[in-house]
A protein has these predicted regions:
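Proline/glycine-rich low-complexity loops and linkers
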Residues: 63-69, 90-179
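N-terminal small/polar loop signature for handling phosphorylated ligands or for N-terminal nucleophile
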Residues: 38-91, 96-98
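An accessory alpha-helical subdomain
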Residues: 154-247
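Conserved short beta-strand edge segments in small beta-sheet-based binding/regulatory domains
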Residues: 247-261
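Short, Lys/Arg-enriched N-terminal segments with co-localized hydrophobic residues
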Residues: 2-10
């Protein structure tokens, strides 16, 4: 498993970082399984933004405000999912406004967007809650259900429904500052993690600009280990992988590339 400090070893001063806040009692209660984290992580990685932290918070305005203010000061971007629907417990919009010290109002741009999906009779007061946007925010398009997300400062607010979140992420992605994509290599070793650990620590020590993580698995009644190497520098990544293969061959472990996993 990744040791403390390994994450920092692959970062540079021009790295673009991010955090994700998952908002919703239904996630914390186990009633709903989050399906957004892995999609967001992969999307951000592909455009050179490193996701460094994920938090799950309740639909409580004060708790959302605290998390947003802490994380937006620490990371290049903060993304949120959930809590921008039409019901009383959808408090994310108000929380983001409170975090930035701005007012919330019905946004004519949001209303116009929603008119493309709803008739005037269907634009009930409940649905118009989804047109409430913090002052100064940019809208994030939602071609699926029309009610937009928004971006205020370095905070991007999206829906929690996976399909809607995905189109919002596609819409906002081109606006974000890009970094160097994180590259990775994976190797499957048919040996327990404990047999690999000492040598793996030596490889990590010799290659501080590469993050090396080990992940045990149990298959066909046997223990094994996936080793994942990550870096923004391809040459350093390849050098670390070469060192890993030298270790594997020296120990006589059965192993194979797992980059398609």
């Amino acid at each position: 498993m990744t040791k403390p400090g390994e994450r920092d070893c692959v970062m540079s001063t021009d790295t673009v970082t991010s955090a994700l806040i998952v908002i919703g009692e239904e996630i914390l209660s186990g009633r709903t399984r989050d399906e957004n984290i892995s999609h967001i992580a992969r999307y951000l990685n592909d455009i050179g933004i490193v996701l460094q932290e994920v938090r799950v918070v309740r639909d409580v305005e004060a708790e959302i405000v605290a998390a947003v203010n802490e994380l937006r000061a620490r990371y290049s971007y903060v993304l949120t999912t959930g809590g921008i629907g039409p019901t009383h417990d959808d408090v994310t919009t108000d929380a983001i406004a409170a975090a930035f010290g701005v007012e919330v109002a019905i946004d004519p741009r949001a209303v116009e967007a929603m008119r493309q999906g709803y008739s005037e009779l269907e634009l009930t007061p409940a649905r118009l809650r989804m047109a409430r946007i913090p002052l100064g925010a940019e809208l994030v398009d939602n071609p699926v259900s029309r009610a937009p997300g928004f971006m205020l400062g370095n905070v991007i607010v999206m829906a929690g429904i996976p399909r809607i979140m995905q189109v919002m992420l596609d819409a906002v992605g081109p606006r974000l500052r890009k970094g160097r994509p994180m590259l990775s290599r994976s190797v499957r070793i048919d040996a327990p993690e404990g047999d690999v650990a000492t040598g793996l620590a030596r490889v990590q020590s010799a290659h501080p600009d590469v993050q090396i993580g080990s992940y045990p698995f149990f298959e066909n009644k046997r223990l094994g280990t996936y080793v994942v190497l990550r870096s923004i520098d391809e040459a350093k990544l390849e050098a670390a992988q070469d060192a890993l293969w030298i270790l594997i061959n020296k120990k006589g472990f059965a192993a194979a590339s797992a980059d398609d996993k």
